[in-house]
Amino acid sequence: MDLTEEVTGKRELPGFSENVIFDEEVICYLHPLHEMVMKGLCDFGKEENLLLLISMLIQRYGQPFENCIPECRGEIEKACRFMEQHFAERIYLDQICRYAGLSKSTLLRAFTKSKGVTPYSYLENIRIGEAKKMLEQGFPPIEAALRTGFSDQSHFTNYFNRFISLSPFLFS
């Protein structure tokens, strides 16, 4: 299924009447996506931001379509369980979608509607929570970072600072 069909539920390309748009919320997705691509960071985060950005552009500026986001409570809970069980591994959006039985677009929209955060943010919250426990138990920050699924200590420190407002070194 192509992305447009996943987002709109229709097998037709959306039309866009505006060539240039000024939308602060679009920039909020575009800027982190650009940073992730330029720094070669997390594929999951890049894919999620790209899909959310494209979905937003189609919904706001494409031809109108029904914006029906299914509840999918059971599927969302399956996605949460998958992330809770596999947080220390490199996780891809495709894996979560297969496990939950939802398309990428449906998972992103329904998950965000249900949980108030994107799947990637949910995963990062789990990882930070587990890393906090490890730091409290005396693990060095680099070990906590690697055991909780962060690719390196720098990535871990940035997320930890953002979520906890302290560096892992000060926290421990």
Predicted regions span which residues?
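Glycine- and acidic-residue-biased ligand/ion/polar-headgroup-sensing regions
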Residues: 1
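Amphipathic alpha-helical segments enriched in hydrophobic/aromatic residues interleaved with Lys/Arg
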Residues: 6-64, 68, 81
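N-terminal positioning helix adjacent to the helix-turn-helix/winged-helix DNA-binding module
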Residues: 25, 29, 71-79, 115, ...
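Amphipathic alpha-helical segments in well-ordered regions
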Residues: 49-61, 86, 126, 130, ...
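Short, basic, alpha-helical segments at the C-terminal edge of helix-turn-helix-like DNA-binding modules
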Residues: 65-67, 123-132, 161, 170-172
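Terminal helix-turn-helix DNA-binding modules in bacterial transcription factors
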Residues: 80-81, 85, 90-95, 102, ...
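A secondary-structure capping/hinge motif
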Residues: 111-118, 159-171
